[in-house]
Structures are given as structure tokens and as C-alpha cells.
């Protein structure tokens, strides 16, 4: 950290989801209204910004304590090349670099899709051990109490429902067909303006239609 982080003026930390867990493209950062971190997050252009507390020992925690603005970009799944996660990540990094004056501006300026800031998130967990049958997709808007999936034991003796604990957007989910009781299955982000968040995700997906040069 001392050899790299201490010499940085701005940081973007690139992450996938865990193994067998996928994430909707999102920015995680501790935001201060009008601060440099918030300006970076808005410039990046991910559909969701999660205003996340710092974790002790993390890169974000280390950098923030030294006054270095830092974003974490989370998208896709570990051990996978997901174009829908990689392309917006590359575009977002380039947008931030242009905003910082590290790169020249675009010849044909494109406005990034507007992002919505989530005011919190939580995981819906498996009620029992068994086989998971998801009922929603990544990026879906869900209502409090809505059915997210069913978990049934292989012999059909028991079945449990996984329901959303809040109105929100599914920003992460398990890809494993098997679930253990208490395992995190669906990550739900909460928004003050849920309609705007849903619209931001739709605009984001529309923006992924490749232009002649998908990166520049």
C-alpha cells in the first residue's frame, strides 16, 4: 500500500462478485455531498451507486483515511469474462480519467446514463437447505414481500420461500443451484426514488448497444 496507494491522487478499485455470485454493475463509495468521491462516482456512469460505509482493513478504508478519493466498481461474477460488466467498467474508468484531465475529451461527447444512489441494502437469505429456483432476474425491481425464489429439499418434503424485505432493485444474486440455510441469495438495494432507479438501469442496458468503437 505504501508503494502504490500513498502515491495516488485518485483510486478506482475493480471487483467482480464472489465465486458463484454475480453483481449488477455498481459503484460503492462513502459519499460526501459535493465531494470529489461523489463527482468521480457520477462521472463513472454505473447505473447504481451504493453509499457504503468503510470496512476496517479495506483498500477504501486505507485510502480514505489518507484523503484519497476512492471508488469500488463491482460487476459480474468471479472467473467469468462478462462483456456487460467489462465494457461499462472500461468506459467508466475512461470517463473518470477524462474528468480528471488525464485523457483528452471525446471527439463525440456521450452523456453517461444517470446513476441513482442507494440509501441502503440487505441480503435475502435461504430459509432452509435445498435447491434454489430463482423467480427474479438481476436488475429487477421488487416490492416488499415479493417472491424472489423458492428453496426445496431434493425429496420434496419441504419448501421455503425467499421474499424481499423491502422495495428495491436486485443488485446481486447467487448463481448456485444449491443453498444452505441462512446463505445470502439475493442482494436488494433500497432507493428513495425507486422509479428513477429502475429507469436508470433500463437506460444503462440500452447504452450497452455497441457503438462503432465500444471503448472510445
Positions of predicted regions on the chain:
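Structured catalytic-domain cores with a bias toward divalent-metal coordination
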Residues: 1-216
Amino acid at each position: 500500500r505504501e508503494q502504490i496507494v500513498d502515491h495516488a491522487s485518485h483510486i478506482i478499485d475493480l471487483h467482480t462478485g464472489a465465486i458463484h455470485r454475480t453483481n449488477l454493475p455498481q459503484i460503492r463509495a462513502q459519499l460526501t455531498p459535493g465531494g470529489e468521491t461523489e463527482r468521480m462516482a457520477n462521472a463513472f456512469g454505473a447505473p447504481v451507486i451504493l453509499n457504503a460505509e468503510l470496512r476496517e482493513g479495506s483498500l477504501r478504508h486505507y485510502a480514505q483515511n489518507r484523503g484519497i478519493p476512492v471508488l469500488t466498481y463491482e460487476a459480474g461474477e468471479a472467473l467469468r469474462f462478462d462483456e456487460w460488466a467489462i465494457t461499462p467498467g472500461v468506459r467508466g474508468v475512461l470517463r473518470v480519467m477524462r474528468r480528471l484531465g488525464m485523457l483528452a475529451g471525446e471527439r463525440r461527447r456521450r452523456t453517461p446514463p444517470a446513476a441513482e444512489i442507494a440509501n441502503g441494502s440487505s441480503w435475502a437469505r435461504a430459509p432452509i437447505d435445498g435447491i434454489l429456483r430463482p423467480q427474479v432476474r438481476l436488475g429487477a425491481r421488487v416490492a416488499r414481500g415479493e417472491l424472489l425464489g423458492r428453496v426445496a429439499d431434493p425429496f420434496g418434503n419441504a419448501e421455503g420461500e425467499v421474499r424481499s424485505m423491502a422495495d428495491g432493485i436486485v443488485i446481486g444474486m447467487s448463481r448456485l443451484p444449491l443453498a444452505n440455510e441462512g446463505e445470502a441469495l439475493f442482494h436488494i438495494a433500497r432507493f428513495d426514488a425507486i422509479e428513477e432507479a429502475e429507469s436508470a438501469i433500463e437506460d444503462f442496458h440500452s447504452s450497452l448497444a455497441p457503438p462503432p468503437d465500444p471503448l472510445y
